[in-house]
Amino acid sequence: MDINQKYNLWLTFDDETKKELESVTDKKEIEDRFYKDLEFGTGGLRGIMGAGTNRMNSYTVGKASLGFAKYLKDKYDGEISVAIACDSRLNSRAFEWDSARVFASQGIKVYAYTQIVPVPMLSFATRYLHCNAGVMITASHNPKEYNGYKAYDSTGCQLCTDDAKEVLSYINAIDDYSSVYNDVKTVDEYISDGMIVGVYEELFDEFIKAVKTQSLYNEHSELKIVYTPLHGTGNVPVRKVLEDKTVYVVKEQEEPNGNFPTVVSPNPEDRKALTLGIELAKEKDADIVLGTDPDCDRVGVAVKHNGEYVLLTGNQTGALLVNFVLTMKKDSLNSKSTLVKTIVTSELGANIGRSFGLQVEE
């Protein structure tokens, strides 16, 4: 099917899609919307929101969910369940419910967060509830025009390359985008049937407890922290974890807002995104600035040095964390202790690990 055929087919889907597509007069934009399907990989789906096969919308989300559901049904016997969550981005909640409905239509029980939550809480739910898989609706630190669909396995980790390729084969076997919602009932109907179960309070409490259990340093500290969630999901859980610390929150960026009105891109590793945080840090004479992206799986760190705030790179932050963890655990290290690094991570953390006598695996 060529681009024009795809375009004309999508005009028949629903009134809103038709209206949006008819408003597009630029042939190059039409081509960009339909020249390929939105790619599914180890990071799931990610793209600009809008109508078209190369966009994030209800149909591409539904198709991905249907393919993922069919993959799970072939892989597992007995009752299958998935955990689903979303961040603060535009349309995230709608995409979460779209996914939930499709999974439920395939006989898969869905545990859906009723509040926006960070990615780690989705991974936690997948394990805590003994789910076979998880889905997070988010585009991480991308600009407001984007959204995405991250897929997780039963361990709460993103799909590995081989699994992602297999899921993709199921997705690609679905030719008709408009058919993904055939015989799919409403969210309320699936809730009544017990196929969609809303979750939040218990999982939030258990997650916070699990995070605090990992702490290696519980002594009182005079450290003053500035924190910004950058309009994302981190505000409530991060403040809860740090409730016994001195924390100043950037008020202008405190509330969830998918338009991210105070930043161009909500990437905490970009100094521009931490401008307000650094201004507050100077006002409060804080020691450190922490910022998290919308789905709260990325942290930016700025530390006070000679009266100025220096933004650390991810590699620098990681190396400091490695040094801290190994220092605190040095008495329990042995000949089998191992540090695992990715190929895109600098050697600094690995060298620190070796200095403590650890084996290093890449």
List PLM regions with ranges.
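An N-terminal, well-structured beta->alpha segment
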Residues: 5-99, 196-222
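Gly/Ser/Thr-enriched, mixed-charge loops and adjacent short helices
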Residues: 29-34, 38, 147-273, 281
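Secondary-structure transition/capping motifs at alpha-helix termini
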Residues: 73-77, 102-111, 129-133, 177, ...
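N-terminal small/polar loop signature for handling phosphorylated ligands or for N-terminal nucleophile
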Residues: 83-146, 248-300
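Glycine-rich phosphate-binding loops at beta-strand->alpha-helix junctions
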Residues: 87-93, 229-236, 345
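Short Gly/Thr/Asp-enriched flexible loops that form oxyanion-binding sites at enzyme active sites
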Residues: 95-103, 145-153, 238, 297-317, ...
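Proline/glycine-rich low-complexity loops and linkers
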Residues: 114, 172-199, 305-362
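Acidic, glycine-rich loop-and-beta core segments that form the ion-binding/anion-interacting portion
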Residues: 236-238, 254, 275-285, 291-329
